[in-house]
Amino acid sequence: MGTTTIEAQNYCIYFNEEGTRFINDLIAERRPSKLFLLVDSHTNEHCLPVFLPDLATDIPLEIIEIEAGEPNKNIDTCTQVWYALSELGADRKSLLINIGGGVVTDLGGFVASTFMRGIDFINVPTSLLAMVDASVGGKTGGDLGALKNLIGVINNPLGVMVDTRFLATLPAEELRSGMAEMFKHGLISSPEYWQQMCQLNELPAEYLGVLIRESVVIKNEVVRQDPTEKGLRKTLNYGHTLGHAIESYCLQNPERERLLHGEAVAIGMVLATYLSVRELGFPQAECDHIKAVLAEYFPKQSFSNEEITDICQLMRFDKKNVGGNVYFVLLEAIGKPKIDCIVPFEEIYKAFEYYLS
């Protein structure tokens, strides 16, 4: 994997050894009063043994562990971490290092942004999804019940360390979840990158690192042009309007098998692409190809008519809605997204019929 640093909005994204140097140099220069490492039950066991030996500092260090998984990305967990920081002696000169997937980096960034009106933090994404998605853009926060990401602020870390050694700690389904966002970046921004992702199974394993960096570059360029999501940045929500609703539905209904974020977004992308055919004249053959490519990585899920109705109701709570309207990102062509598309609800049912066929 290339080690060229990527300049983001007021911070940088460092790769592998450069990330280690960045963290050690920053701690030596700033001399925070105390270090806090936020981990979950998985990264405490699997990722800290990779991270800690490279941390060169004599500054006091505390580890705060939260339970892993999306169901714990909520205000109750934030409160637990705020209390832990307070009881362990954190002050405004402390530094929080968030080591984990998107739940840890999103929630940890929000905790840091609000504790004592804001302390410094660094993100160390350990899942593929967090590396290519949560590493860029400064979005922090948590869920409100089963409603995704309704609470939060935009606040940038001091820096991000992407270390591909952590990928070896991930189960296969977590790797696939991250690939969904990589496929998305190609579909909304780069036909060439989409074609590379289509050939992923034929590429040598070490090439994944190149694709990760390119995915970060794509998202970073979108965020750089539109940091507050007034226009272009909305394109990153492709597949997410229905994807988030599907993910929320599974969280609300534990009798259903839980879907990871990327798994739900992959379904959302198939649905959004079919809606693009219906609403914008996107080529049906290309839609079928996108569906087939994603089906190689994401097994088809079943949905009853009643479940589809419930999912559509959840979609009304999407934080991107305005004035009661549900807005979609659709495709005019691969690499040519269109934002703020209003779609008739009956078309959404037809999209599910297409997905299930």
Regions found by a protein language model. Give the residues of each.
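Short glycine/serine/threonine-rich phosphate/pyrophosphate-binding segments
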Residues: 103-110, 131, 244-245
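Active-site segments that bind and position negatively charged phosphate/pyrophosphate groups
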Residues: 196-309
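Catalytic, metal-anchored helix/loop core of enzyme active sites in primary metabolism
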Residues: 9, 225, 250, 348-357
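Generic secondary-structure signature for well-ordered alpha-helical cores
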Residues: 90, 156-159, 165-172, 180-192, ...
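A glycine/threonine-rich phosphate-anchoring loop and its flanking beta-alpha core
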Residues: 110-200
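C-terminal charged capping/lid subdomain of soluble metabolic enzymes
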Residues: 180-182, 284-357
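ATP/NTP phosphate-donor binding region
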Residues: 1-94
